[in-house]
Amino acid sequence: MSSPVSRWTLRLSVLIAAIVVLVLFGLSRSIIGQAPVPFRSPPPGSPPAKIRAYGEFAGCPEEPALFHRCAQEKAKTFVPPRTPDGKPDFQGFWNRIGIRNLENIEEHPESLDGSGGRSSIVDPADGRIPYQRWAAAKRDAHFEKYLDAGQYCLPDGAPRFLWGATKFVVQTPGYVFMLNDYADTYRIIPTDGRPHIGPKIRLWQGDLRGRWEGNTLVVDATNQLAETTLDHIGNFISPDAKVVERLTMIDKDVIYITTTIEDAKVFTRPWTVAFGWRRNPNPKYESWEQGCWEGVQSSLKYTDEGRKRSHGAFEK
């Protein structure tokens, strides 16, 4: 029979071993958490990510910051086609130029197509979202889960509506209509000068009001219904965000777009994203109804692929 001393020695040894295992496990999780994550923004001060080369559209580089500068110059001289009422004619099917920032609107070393992407943020100049400290911590928690409203087939709010894939645009006097190929969402944008609705009414797209400033369509979005994610990885804005979108044609087949977001609850200052649309060249293209609802397998497969490649992400 073992003595009381030997039994206590054994228990102490087991306890010490358990503590060592827990410490090592916690350390490994910490190390993993600090490792480069495919879709996560590199820490401030990191060297530029190694990514696949960008293309070119309408004589402008596809890379967001370069496209932004080039498009600003082209917008000064390009004369767009006109609708019968004299407004720039944006009608037709449009695709986003590049999909590299669907995962993360900031710079990231990898995307689902393997190319990676430079930041689509052109102001501030460092390409970083100017989060308040608490909001940055919440964003980091989203990163660990690859949190995206798309897995629930929730409608894209402003500003993400314009950042997605195919759009169909129709114009009439006093209105611009936009149909999204994702989740059958759409926009009805009055351009007749009417005021915004009351602040107590909240909408998925926000309350939209458009106006023409020369050749540029300016859309103000207020009254967001809920907190909205901006990309697959979980950057976000609050329902009180104010969004200003500016769409300018720089070529008969290219529209240059900027989105400025102001949200005093989440950010330390307003910030701006730049990107573009290119005209769909297929004259027979049709936008089909998308089967999209919470739990639909096609959406789960897409977001699960992102989770598999993100540290800390949960599995289905």
Question: Where do the model's predicted regions map?
Answer:
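N-terminal secretory signal peptides that target proteins for export/translocation
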Residues: 1-11
